[in-house]
From Swiss-Prot:
The keyword Ubl conjugation does not apply. The lineage of its organism: Bacteria, Pseudomonadati, Pseudomonadota, Gammaproteobacteria, Candidatus Pseudothioglobaceae. It is found in: Cytoplasm. This is Uridylate kinase. It catalyses: UMP + ATP = UDP + ADP.
């Protein structure tokens, strides 16, 4: 039996894209299969999605757009991604609910309410959080840390392009070694860029475990991690 009862999965927006599609339907279905595998273990799951496949606020500022406006555009991009994931969930008979850090009218999605979110998770629904913290100048990593704390998640599972945290960039350095586990203090001391400083500080303060792993190459990876297999890198106190 897994030690996890409720998890938060952090996905980048880029993970949804392919060479031909901003939002790739094959990838969406893979993500839903992964969600199903988590639910089949009687583990509750919430997701925080980025928007970098559409617009990234930090990138837009380089074009001359005001930083605050750029971040708002980036947050709207995450809402688009969340709706796409939720729609694919519903098509596959997975009950999903989108909750946004920005107030969006017209019945498009719900505003974030941590009490309602926890109640929905207990009923087996998947919560897809979007729009980060709802404020500019914060990353979706910080949004993930905040939402995980709000819903009382046991851990954040951060899906990345590589299968964990390494001593160096494994793409540039083939001799880089992967860490199986790290303490928060070790990660800070070694200056390992796991999350931005604000997100990492929140996780450390609230003793919120972080697992960094690669998800889409093998759709069983998250399920295997939840069963206790030593994959990726765990960061804890």
């Amino acid at each position: 039996m897994s030690k996890y009862k409720r998890i938060l999965l952090k996905l980048s927006g880029e993970a949804l894209a392919s060479t031909t599609n901003i939002i790739d339907p094959v990838t969406l279905n893979k993500i839903v299969d992964i969600i199903k595998s988590v639910l089949s273990q009687n583990i509750e799951i919430a997701i925080v999605i980025g928007g970098g496949n559409i617009f990234r606020g930090e990138t837009l500022t380089k074009t001359g757009i005001n930083r605050i406006t750029s971040d708002h555009i980036g947050m709207l991009s995450t809402i688009i991604n969340a709706l796409a994931i939720a729609d694919t969930c519903q098509k596959n008979k997975v009950d999903a609910l989108v909750m946004s850090g920005l107030s969006i009218g017209g019945g498009i999605c719900n505003s974030i309410n941590h009490i309602y979110a926890k109640q929905a998770l207990k009923k087996g629904k998947v919560i897809i959080f979007c729009a980060g913290t709802g404020n500019p100048c914060f990353t979706t990593d910080t949004g993930a840390a905040l939402r995980a704390i709000e819903i009382g998640a046991d851990a954040i599972f951060k899906a990345t392009k590589v299968d964990g945290i390494y001593t160096d960039d494994p793409v540039k350095n083939p001799n880089a070694k992967r860490y199986n586990s790290l303490s928060f203090d070790e990660a800070i001391e070694k200056n390992l860029q796991i999350m931005d400083v604000s997100a990492f500080a929140l996780c450390r303060k609230h003793d919120l475990e972080i697992c960094v792993f690669s998800m889409l190459e093998n759709t069983n990876t998250l399920s295997d991690l939840l069963k206790g297999k030593l994959l990726g890198t765990i960061v804890r106190k």
